[in-house]
Amino acid sequence: MRRHTAIVIIGFMVLATGRLPAQAEPGSIDARRELARALVGAWLPLESGLAVSAREGTPLSAKYEIEDGAFQLSVYTWKADTVSGDSFTEVIVDFSTGLVARVDTITGGNDLAAAQRQKATMARAKRSLGEATADAVRANAGYRAVSAMPGLDGSRPLAEVTLVRGDEWKIITVRLD
């Protein structure tokens, strides 16, 4: 168990070094436990949330999270507009109905910077984040996706998909090219 914990901590440290635009999952053990408990009540797989959010734009990243005490599925999307320029949104998908609950425009700060980096990565991708996430879940029976974040390894686009099964967490790297 200690070895598994060490591997998870190292994975979090890799994410914190800046290779990816944002941390994919909560850092503390208590936060991970709380998120894992909340996921039990969410029937909607992350990869389905990516598909649902696609009506608002191209999905750039997705994560189940607890924000301000509320459990939610958040997906960043991007939509090209030749007249007004690119637009970025955070789509909150209702995990109990599988419908879009809310769409918020991302206009500045760290969220906009992260969305722009994610767009640059996904522009190099030959496959969608949803496909990569589904592949990671299929290859890891019994696990479900908690987050999917695009990043670059040099110039190669990839997705880091965080998976959970009970209290076991792992991060899978999936190529997007």
Whereabouts are the PLM-identified features?
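Long, terminal "pre-/pro-" and other extracytoplasmic accessory regions
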Residues: 2-6, 18-177
